[in-house]
């Protein structure tokens, strides 16, 4: 069973020479915009091996010379593949007996013995699985008294110096360009110190904690100057959620608002990333500016859209001069003229727009994104949480229902962890009041549960896991909201399916691994309905990873059906939606469904049915907008982009990309 098929989704096939240049001359050409040595790999494991190779070589060189190898290590998620590779090498015989490790940062203040310390996590991930001596492990002490912090940081700095400085330091990067926990505003000369973490950093750290326990407000961190004294620096990042900050770090100016840019001043710093994290580097996203290109349809569309945005012109007004002045003369040679390129791309984009997301019956579908037949279609919309369906494609769902298709909504997880305690209190007050008013307070189960839950919530401390009963009630609240939204959109309640995939039910932010039980639940639904059209979440960068695991479960089930040569699958198309956390890039859009002002208002109303996910929802991310506002803004932006390119002007649009099993 293939459990990570989402990682194989490649929207744009990047030519190998863009990330693995054949010669030094080629590398010099394609990296001309990059100010730090950057190594890009198609797979995370390959990048981890590069770092592990360097560390292994340094360890062995130190062993030969009879000295210690001094490492600085962070504990971000991006370092986990590196630790796994080093552990594998240890199991094959690599000794870490001569290795000294300095932890890059620690939370402050901490209680003695806290299992949420950065050092505890480093032990779990790496130190306890290799033969590093306990006396060779150093870390800032998060339990130290506040009056002694400055002296402690100076001592930590001196310990690094006494060991001869760091031979290699391996760090991740925060969304704001943090290295270790040096926040925006950190100076080039800063040394080990206490620092107040901002809200975005604390949110990232909360995910590492694996619970809702508040992250301590401060950290004790190596300073920028401390890091830059290392002989060799590795900065790692994986996944498209890091693409923007990597582009600013590697290609942008040095600025204290992005501390990672200080690495540009080091003579042996290397950024190690995968293709997803490299997605916004010039050589990947705008290769025509640095080298010759093989002009695929998608790359041509991307270049023309970029040219329109740069010149402020719609597609059909671009001239030969525009192409020549902006490094796109190759397209003129390929197509004969700018006019020919313009017509092709305009038509390509025009053909993505459809008011018939399920296909228009009895119509020529040659240039339509979805086929006309069969009609009506059996449709399943898979929604990771009980509101992702309406947030991401609420307008399309209403259109499918209104046009007569047999629409089913499958809510993959309970979403219970995203319900606030006050919602439970409100519903328990209602149930208790109902018991008193209508059944003479005679239901002893209700009375006991009301008392137990009231007592538990009153005594609940940050980080305490909800009881099974409370999680069930929170799940019921979300089920009720989902049913209300489905009814509003015209979907019969017997077409609403709550899958409650087991991987989600950890009771914590950190979920269980997606497994065979999850896949079988999805597969059973597919075999029951045998859909001719499927919609799945392509919004794989959600903060807690639920979307990716849910989509992986669907793709794994489809893959099993494909292996079994299921007849129904031959007549089925799979579409990926986004909207809750991101939107599709226009070069990848294959179907775009427009909405009128009235339809957009109906979509908003369907999102608002999920009342527990409004202002009081625990996990709104670092975006201050509510989900309906984010959704509308993205839909407005997509419509505006189409209009700016010279296509029809709509109020809003929802975009989709096809997945081929």
Which residues does each PLM region occupy?
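Ligand-binding beta-strand-loop-alpha-helix segment within the catalytic cores
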Residues: 22-35, 94-168
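Glycine-rich N-terminal segment of FAD-binding domains in flavoprotein oxidoreductases
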Residues: 63-92
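ATP/nucleoside-binding phosphotransfer catalytic cores, i.e., glycine-rich phosphate-binding loops
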Residues: 2-12, 25, 30, 225, ...
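Histidine-anchored nucleotide/phosphate-binding helix
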Residues: 82-92, 390-414, 418
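Class I SAM-dependent methyltransferase SAM-binding "motif I" and its flanking Rossmann-like core
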Residues: 180-224
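Short, surface-exposed, charged loop/turn segments at secondary-structure junctions
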Residues: 175-197, 250-253, 548-557, 590-595
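N-terminal glycine-/serine-/threonine-rich phosphate-binding loop
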Residues: 2-70, 365-366, 373
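Metal-dependent de-N-acetylase/amidase catalytic core
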Residues: 202-210, 214-219, 311-380, 399-403, ...
């Amino acid at each position: 069973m293939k459990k990570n098929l989402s990682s194989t989704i490649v929207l744009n096939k990047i030519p190998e020479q863009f990330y693995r240049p054949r010669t030094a001359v080629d590398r010099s050409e394609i990296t001309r915009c990059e100010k730090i040595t950057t190594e890009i790999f198609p797979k995370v494991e390959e990048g981890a091996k590069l770092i592990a190779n360097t560390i292994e070589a340094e360890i062995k060189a130190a062993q030969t010379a009879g000295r210690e190898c001094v490492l600085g290590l962070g504990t971000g998620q991006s370092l986990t593949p590196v630790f796994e590779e080093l552990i594998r090498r240890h199991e094959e015989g690599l000794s870490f007996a001569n290795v000294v490790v300095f932890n890059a940062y620690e939370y402050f203040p901490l209680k003695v013995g806290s299992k949420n310390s950065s050092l505890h996590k480093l032990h779990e991930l790496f130190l306890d699985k290799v033969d590093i001596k306990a006396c060779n492990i150093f870390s800032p002490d998060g339990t130290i008294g506040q009056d002694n912090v400055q002296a402690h940081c100076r001592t930590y700095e001196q310990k690094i110096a006494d060991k001869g400085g760091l031979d290699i330091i391996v760090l991740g990067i925060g969304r704001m360009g943090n290295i270790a926990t040096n926040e925006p505003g950190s100076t080039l000369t800063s040394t080990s110190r206490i620092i107040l973490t901002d809200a975005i950093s604390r949110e990232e750290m909360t995910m590492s904690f694996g619970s809702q326990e508040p992250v301590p407000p401060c950290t004790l961190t190596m300073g920028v100057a401390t890091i830059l004294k290392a002989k060799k620096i590795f900065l790692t990042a994986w996944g498209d959620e890091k693409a923007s900050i990597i582009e600013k770090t590697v290609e942008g100016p040095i600025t204290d608002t992005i501390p990672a840019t200080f690495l540009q001043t080091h003579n042996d710093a290397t950024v190690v990333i995968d293709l997803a994290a490299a997605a916004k580097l010039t050589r990947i996203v705008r290769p025509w500016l640095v080298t010759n290109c093989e002009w695929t349809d998608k790359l041509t569309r991307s270049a023309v859209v970029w040219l329109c945005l740069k010149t402020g012109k719609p597609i059909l007004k671009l001239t030969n001069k525009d192409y020549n002045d902006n490094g796109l003369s190759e397209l003129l040679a390929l197509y004969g003229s700018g006019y020919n390129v313009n017509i092709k791309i305009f038509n390509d984009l025009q053909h993505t727009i459809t008011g018939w997301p399920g296909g228009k019956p009895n119509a020529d579908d040659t240039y339509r994104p979805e086929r006309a037949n069969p009609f009506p279609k059996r449709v399943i919309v898979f929604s990771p949480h009980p509101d992702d369906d309406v947030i991401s494609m609420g307008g399309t769902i209403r259109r499918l229902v209104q046009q007569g298709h047999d629409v089913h909504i499958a809510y993959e997880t309970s979403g219970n962890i995203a319900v606030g305690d006050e919602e439970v209190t409100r519903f328990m007050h209602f149930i208790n009041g109902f018991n008193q008013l209508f059944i003479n307070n005679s239901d002893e189960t209700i009375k006991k549960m009301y008392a137990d839950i009231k007592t538990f919530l009153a005594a609940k401390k940050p980080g305490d896991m909800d009881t099974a009963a409370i999680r069930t009630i929170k799940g019921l609240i979300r089920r009720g909201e989902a049913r209300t939204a489905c009814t509003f959109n015209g979907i019969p309640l017997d077409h609403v399916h709550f899958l409650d995939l087991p991987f989600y039910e950890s009771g914590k932010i950190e979920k269980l691994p997606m497994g065979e039980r999850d896949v079988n639940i999805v597969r059973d639904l597919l075999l029951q309905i045998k859909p001719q059209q499927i919609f799945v979440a392509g919004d794989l960068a959600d903060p807690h990873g639920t979307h990716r695991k849910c989509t992986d479960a669907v793709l794994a089930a489809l893959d099993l059906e494909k292996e079994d040569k299921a007849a129904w699958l031959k007549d089925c198309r799979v579409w990926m939606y986004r909207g809750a956390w991101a939107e599709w890039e226009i070069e990848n859009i294959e179907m775009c469904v427009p909405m009128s002002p009235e339809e957009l208002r109906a979509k908003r109303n369907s999102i608002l049915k999920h009342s527990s996910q409004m202002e009081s929802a625990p996990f709104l991310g670092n975006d201050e907008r509510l989900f309906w506002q984010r959704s509308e803004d993205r839909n407005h932006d997509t419509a505006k982009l189409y209009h700016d390119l010279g296509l029809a002007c709509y109020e809003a649009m929802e975009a989709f990309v096809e997945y081929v099993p």
